[in-house]
Amino acid sequence: MHTIQMSIYVLGLLVALALIFDFMNGFHDAANAIATVVSTGVLKPQTAVAMSAVFNFVAIFTVGVHVATTVGKGTVDPSVVDHYVVFGALVGAIIWNVVTWYYGIPSSSSHALIGGLVGAAVAKSGTGALVGSGLLKTVIFIVVSPLMGFVLGSVVMLIVSWVFVRSTPRKVDTWFRRLQLFSAAAYSLGHGGNDAQKTIGIIWMLLIVAGVTAPTATEPPLWVIISCYTAISLGTLFGGWRIVKTMGQKITKLKPVGGFCAESGGAITLFVATAAGIPVSTTHTITGAIVGVGSAQKASAVRWGVAGNIVWAWIFTIPASAFMAAIAWWIGKHIL
């Protein structure tokens, strides 16, 4: 990978911007990890946020950096990446996150970042800047991750319903109010493990381009890993409350047993994707799982209109953030 001349101030600005995105990722996507456990009344919002923040950070000790490698080297051609491309990608993703947070739309921070990278790279060098195989893997999992969440959420719900068929509703509720603490923790662990790595990949790519880190390095610097996990944990701690209601109650009404099944299905999907180095959307995953839980009870339990609006937000995320990133790239060329 080529290196470019970059002042320490510009490098510092871009690293700070990446950490701001990571903070906003935690802030924006906090609802994914806590919405079910809050909406079922198992935990109070403040307690749920604190628990989620802790497990987002703990993920640093439990997963590798496979996702960071995909984002840093497998989405766009590293030879076209410079500080302008990174600036455009981050600004485009941040703007889309702010817009969707303001309107309470549970869109994907992950795909906003991928879209930002694509838009800025194409603005600089055309479509030849894209790594087709890596981008295809990401696009495929836009569909696969919510489907996996849907299937696993519904299967777990059906199994649980069969196992506890003779139990009283009160007994089931008591059991799953406890079990949901574990499933919520597992989902937060999966969220931190997959999502923080996307920003690690961006900063790693930036450091290689600036000549600070060797392009042959197999892992990013330790300070990058710690900084990114800290930023996403702090973002989670402050939480994006506008989205909690949509995720927790508007799609389908959840009880503790449903919350447990949705979080379990979502967590399994995230762990599998992270192990495979695939940057999936935690938003897509938990939404699919929630819909799966609702439909396992009965199709009418799902508010399909709300689910449809969320799908439209997913479809527009990559092109919208790519468009904003292309504009930000052009602006960055004139101010950095």
State where each predicted segment sits:
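Multi-pass alpha-helical transmembrane bundle typical of ion/small-solute transporters
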Residues: 1-336
